[in-house]
Swiss-Prot record:
It is found in: Cell inner membrane. It is an enzyme of class 7 (translocase). Its EC number is 7.3.2.1. GO terms for molecular function: ATP binding; ATP hydrolysis activity; ATPase-coupled phosphate ion transmembrane transporter activity. GO terms for cellular component: plasma membrane. It comes from Brucella abortus (strain 2308). Pfam families: ABC_tran. Coiled coil: none annotated. This is Phosphate import ATP-binding protein PstB. It catalyses: phosphate(out) + ATP + H2O = ADP + 2 phosphate(in) + H(+).
Amino acid sequence: MNLMAERSLENAVGEKMNATASSIKMRGEKVCVFYGEKQALFDVDLDIPEKMVTALIGPSGCGKSTFLRSLNRMNDTIEGCRIAGRITLDNEDIYDPRLDVVELRARVGMVFQKPNPFPKSIYENVAYGPRIHGLARSKAELEEIVVTSLQKASLFEEVKDRLHDAGTGLSGGQQQRLCIARAIAVSPEVILMDEPCSALDPIATAKVEELIDELRQNFTIVIVTHSMQQAARVSQRTAMFHLGNLVEVGDTEMMFTAPTEKRTQDYITGRFG
C-alpha cells in the first residue's frame, strides 16, 4: 500500500472513530449502586448511542431497572440509595453536585411501567411540563406544543375532540401514550422506558412499539423489558444484566442470534429467568 493510500485509510478510520465517539449520548463508567448495605450493581460500563433504542434485558432483580433509574437520578428518591462510578450525558457528569436535577429530568424523561397520568385533563397532562419549565411564551405556543406532542405520540387523532376530558378516562394504552406525550412535551434528549407495555394488551403494545420506532428518529431511547420478542423488535442495541453485572452488550441481531456469553444464550432461550 502506498503512502497516500495509507493516509487515506488512516483518515477514514479516524473519521469513523470520531463519528462513533460523538454518537454516544450517555455513558456509564464503573457504575455501582447500593441500597443500604446491599449492592445492586457492580462496575457497570455501558454506552448509550444517540438516536437508537437500547434494550436492557435480564431476569427479575438483575439490576436493569436500577441502572435505568440511575440515568436520570430517580434513585435519589430512594432512602439509603447511593451510587459510585460515573454517568455522563453529553460528557457532563450527571451526579455533579452543581447539576440541576430538575433540568436533568427534563433532558432525560421517564415513562413508567404503569401508566400514571395526572388527575387532570388530557390537555393539562401535556401542558404541565412546558408551563413549569417556561417553554411557551404564549397560550398559542403552549397549545402548539400540546398538539405536536400528542401527534408525535400517535394520540392526537384519537383525543382531539375531548382534550379537556380527564386523562384517567382513557384506555390503558392511550394513557401510556399520553404519558409518552407528556415526556416529549418538555423536549427531552433521552427517553427512559421501564417496561412500558407490561400492563397493556397486545393491540396497545403493538401501538406503543410502533411509536418507539418512530420516536428514535428524534430521541435516544433506553427501554427495560422482560419480553425477548419486544427487545428484538424495537431495539438496535441490547444489554444483558444478571445478578447486578452487565454480562454482555452488542447489536440486537447479534445478541439474539450469536451471543458470546453462555448466560445470555441461556436467558434468551428460556433456560432461566
